[in-house]
């Protein structure tokens, strides 16, 4: 889990360059609109949920309208963490958490409680105290009983234990692990089940989206907990991802957890990029949001995808990774970005693309071919009287071809479908002009020329 960010006007000045560039891109492009039907209806038709992390104090105006319309799950970004609800021992503040739960109930939404046992954002009195194992166990169990019990019957799921592992798959050295050993996890799950038998109980972590040492440690933990009869209903894959680094084993990993007999949720999805954003980066981000959501849709026991804040104005990324951002489906002015439309298409919806000017077209050719490799070229041309300020082309290979390195364009391939968008320097195609890009690829058996769509 990651914290929600501070208001946008408090951000460091250098980041405004990237924000302004992104705004210019979105203003210059034809107007984009939210889906009709909204995301929550598209997800429901697939038997899934689509959620967002929210800040309770912002659930008014446009922010509240989008949160209520588009999503059927809400996760409190910070409001239910121990440091928020009990900053002083024995003194509780449920204002923000209650506001989110009340909003969700008014908008027919489920709530994912986040989070009960974590190494971060604990109250200082807890972190700085000296506790015996018995005292620490009692504190943890009492906290879980109090918070889960307060919302009994009102929350659908809880992230009971958050981020228990290091990157190499060893247990993170935390207050809980150091005081109670690995058994703190089973204790926490058991206490949560006792406090609300109907709520689904999850272990949640980051960098566990693909098959790796950390996700395998989580897999082994869940397998062992189930073998011991400890209540565990699901795993949360946070999915704080970097543009161009979506794990190729994401769907395989989701499936292996599902095969253990637990649900899987993508709980904190965002895909960050180096600022400034460009049309090419936004197009690639759209493809990657589409791929992540499709991986969940493909696995029956993957129940939900939650984005970690739906708007760039409420994202934790810029304050944590200076110079990076544009990670969410909506821009800072609440306009849906290409990433939003990637979610739409992954959920089976349709997107009305801006019309390509008459007289502009794209042509594919094979410039060179050898053994199992080839070089492909694509040329975008506009006849006299037509022009483009940016472009994106797609095609579907018919014989298993794969693209490799590309130049003068940003290209991604998902299955047989390839999407390429202009680089920062060649988006404009003037009246009567053309631009070209190329790539190396592989083939086997045959290498037919696909039909290219410009749009």
Regions from the PLM with identified roles:
Residues 72-78, 162, 195-205, 218-247, ...:
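Aromatic- and acid-rich polysaccharide-binding/catalytic face
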Residues 115, 200-208, 239-240, 257-289, ...:
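Active-site clefts of carbohydrate-active enzymes
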Residues 35-77:
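Boundary/entry segment of secreted carbohydrate-active catalytic domains
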Residues 1-34:
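Secretory targeting and sorting signals
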Residues 349-455:
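Extracellular low-complexity, O-glycosylation-prone Ser/Thr/Pro/Gly-rich "stalks"
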Residues 39-40, 69-88, 95-210, 272:
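Substrate-binding cleft and catalytic face of glycoside hydrolase catalytic domains
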Residues 55-70, 137-147, 213-225, 250, ...:
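Short, acidic/polar
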Residues 53-64, 82-95, 165-170, 208-217, ...:
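Acidic-and-aromatic substrate-binding clefts and catalytic sites of carbohydrate-active enzymes
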């Amino acid at each position: 889990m990651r914290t929600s960010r501070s208001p946008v006007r408090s951000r460091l000045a250098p980041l405004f360059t990237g924000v302004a560039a992104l705004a210019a891109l979105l203003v210059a492009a034809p107007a984009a609109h939210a889906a009709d039907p909204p995301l929550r209806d598209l997800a429901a038709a697939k038997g899934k949920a689509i959620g967002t992390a929210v800040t309770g104090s912002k659930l008014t105006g446009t922010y509240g309208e989008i949160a209520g319309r588009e999503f059927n799950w809400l996760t409190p970004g910070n409001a239910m963490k121990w440091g928020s609800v009990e900053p002083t021992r024995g003194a509780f503040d449920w204002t923000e958490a209650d506001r989110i739960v009340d909003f969700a109930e008014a908008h027919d939404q489920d709530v994912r409680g986040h989070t009960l046992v974590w190494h971060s954002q604990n109250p200082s009195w807890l972190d700085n105290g000296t506790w015996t194992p018995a005292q620490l166990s009692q504190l943890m169990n009492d906290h879980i009983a109090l918070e889960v019990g307060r919302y009994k019957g009102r929350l659908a799921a809880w992230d009971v234990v958050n981020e228990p592992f290091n990157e190499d798959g060893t247990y993170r050295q935390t207050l809980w692990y150091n005081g109670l050993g690995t058994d703190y996890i089973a204790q926490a799950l058991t206490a949560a089940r006792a406090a609300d038998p109907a709520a689904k109980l999850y272990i949640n972590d980051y960098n566990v989206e693909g098959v790796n040492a950390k996700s395998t440690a989580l897999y082994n933990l869940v397998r062992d907990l189930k073998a011991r009869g400890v209540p565990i209903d699901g795993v949360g894959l946070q999915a704080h991802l970097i543009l161009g680094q979506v794990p190729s084993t994401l769907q395989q990993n989701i499936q292996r957890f599902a095969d253990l007999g637990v649900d899987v949720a993508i709980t904190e999805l965002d895909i960050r990029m180096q600022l400034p954003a460009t049309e090419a980066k936004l197009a690639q981000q759209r493809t990657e949001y589409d791929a992540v959501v499709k991986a969940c849709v493909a696995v029956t026991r993957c129940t939900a995808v939650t984005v970690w804040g739906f708007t760039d104005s409420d994202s934790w990324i810029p304050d944590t990774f200076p110079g990076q951002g544009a990670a969410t489906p909506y821009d800072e002015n609440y306009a849906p970005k290409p990433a939003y439309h990637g979610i739409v298409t992954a959920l089976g919806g349709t997107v009305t693309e801006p019309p390509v000017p008459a007289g502009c077209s794209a042509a594919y050719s094979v410039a060179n071919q050898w053994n199992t490799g080839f070089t492909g070229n694509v040329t975008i041309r506009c006849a006299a009287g037509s022009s483009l300020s940016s472009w994106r082309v797609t095609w579907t290979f018919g014989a298993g071809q794969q693209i490799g390195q590309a130049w003068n364009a940003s290209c991604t391939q998902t299955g047989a479908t390839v999407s390429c968008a202009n680089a920062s320097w060649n988006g404009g195609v003037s009246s009567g002009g053309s631009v070209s890009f190329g790539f190396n690829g592989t083939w086997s058996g045959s290498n037919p020329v696909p039909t290219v769509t410009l749009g």
